[in-house]
């Protein structure tokens, strides 16, 4: 089964042209108050962690909340950040280290919701490796240095006091999987549904998402980000996007046939067993109240500084609160929205 993530993937120039058109109609819709506010919404990855937005879009939950969301799969968080800073979009679906790097470089893109506030990766290895100590002297593939796959692996190795592992930057999840299949690496850090595909190929899940959670390390694998300047002046739009996302999460967990249909459509999964496992994943791994864990943002920042991927001096003078804003989720909580949604 081919899990290469090419669906909905646009060349950057085409994407920028598309989002400029979306941005140009925001102001009139806000003034008239008659039509849904049209906004570009870049997101990634094309995987199970993005399903709430797909379900919300396909089920008209964004429109119900007064926003006409133009969903554009980009996939690479750094590209999304760069485009947002250029004004091509003001709100997006992503999470993780890219937000930290952006703020420390003077950008104003912050995390405003955490739909998946923990690691959801698995460490897949050759079947001959049966314990964590078997990684010594081996090569493990990740997507990019400083990405979620990298930080998950480093946290795992550090907690198990394993140092002699070669970490190889593969480029993307498809490349990491290919490296494992071809034998160029002994292990790869991947996310569902790729985990399920590798299991069917005979590889071993040495470390599961549950094992990573037991490490007690918070992480924002996915969520919603926004430019602080936009969020401050367009608070109602941000609240509506978060509401639609939460409603998509609820519908996704409650309507198994619909969810499986959309997983099959967008992720090209047709195998009944993989569809079932994918549904179990999305029904169990999303936050009902998508608060951003402050400790997770702090841990990510510290890890990036230790890896020299961000300016450590800048981090020392930057308060942790500069990376996120939980006031939007808190406002929805205080209004009783989440309690009513999940009762």
Feature roles, as predicted:
Residues 1-13, 17, 23-27:
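Short, basic, low-complexity termini and linkers enriched in Ser/Thr/Gly/Pro
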Residues 29-33:
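Sec/Tat signal peptide C-region and signal peptidase I cleavage site
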Residues 34-182, 186-192, 205-209, 214, ...:
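Short, glycine-/small- and polar/acidic-enriched structural segments
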Residues 50, 81, 96, 150, ...:
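Extracytoplasmic/secreted envelope proteins and their assembly/folding machinery
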Residues 147-165, 240-273, 318, 327-336:
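Ligand-binding clefts/hinges and TM-proximal coupling segments of bilobed small-molecule sensing domains
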Residues 175-267:
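Pocket-lining segment of extracytoplasmic ligand-binding domains
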Residues 232-313:
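Secondary-structure end/capping motifs
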Residues 302-343:
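Conserved C-terminal helix/tail region of periplasmic/extracytoplasmic solute-binding proteins
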């Amino acid at each position: 089964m081919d899990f290469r993530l090419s669906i909905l993937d646009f060349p950057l120039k085409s994407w920028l042209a598309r989002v400029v058109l979306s941005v140009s109609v925001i102001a009139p819709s806000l003034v008239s108050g008659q039509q849904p506010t049209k906004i570009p919404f870049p997101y990634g990855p094309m995987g199970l962690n993005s399903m709430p937005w797909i379900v919300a879009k396909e089920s008209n939950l964004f429109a119900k909340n007064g926003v006409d969301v133009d969903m554009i799969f980009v996939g690479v968080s750094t590209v999304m950040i760069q485009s947002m800073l250029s004004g091509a979009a003001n709100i997006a679906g992503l999470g993780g280290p890219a937000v930290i790097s952006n703020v420390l470089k003077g950008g104003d893109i912050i995390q405003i919701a955490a739909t998946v506030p923990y690691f959801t990766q698995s460490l897949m290895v050759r079947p001959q490796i049966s314990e964590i100590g078997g990684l010594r002297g081996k090569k493990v593939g990740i997507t990019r240095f400083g990405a979620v796959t990298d930080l998950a692996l480093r946290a795992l190795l550090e907690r198990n006091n394993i140092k002699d592992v070669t970490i190889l930057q593969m480029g993307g999840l498809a490349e990491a999987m290919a490296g494992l299949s071809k034998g160029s690496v002994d292990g790869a850090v991947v996310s569902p549904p790729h985990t399920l595909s590798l299991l069917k190929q005979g590889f071993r899940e040495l470390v599961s998402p549950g094992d990573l959670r037991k490490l007690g390390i918070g992480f924002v694998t996915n969520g919603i980000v926004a430019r602080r300047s936009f969020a401050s002046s367009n608070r109602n739009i941000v609240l509506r996007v978060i509401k639609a996302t939460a409603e998509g999460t609820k519908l996704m967990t409650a309507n198994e046939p619909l969810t499986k249909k959309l997983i099959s459509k967008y992720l090209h999964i047709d195998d009944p067993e993989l569809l079932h496992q994918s549904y179990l994943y999305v029904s169990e791994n999303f936050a009902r109240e998508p608060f951003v864990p402050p400790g997770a943002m702090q841990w990510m920042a510290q890890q990036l500084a230790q890896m020299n991927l961000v300016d450590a001096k800048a981090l020392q003078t930057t308060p942790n609160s500069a990376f996120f804003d939980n006031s939007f989720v808190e406002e929805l909580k205080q209004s009783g929205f989440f309690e009513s949604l999940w009762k």
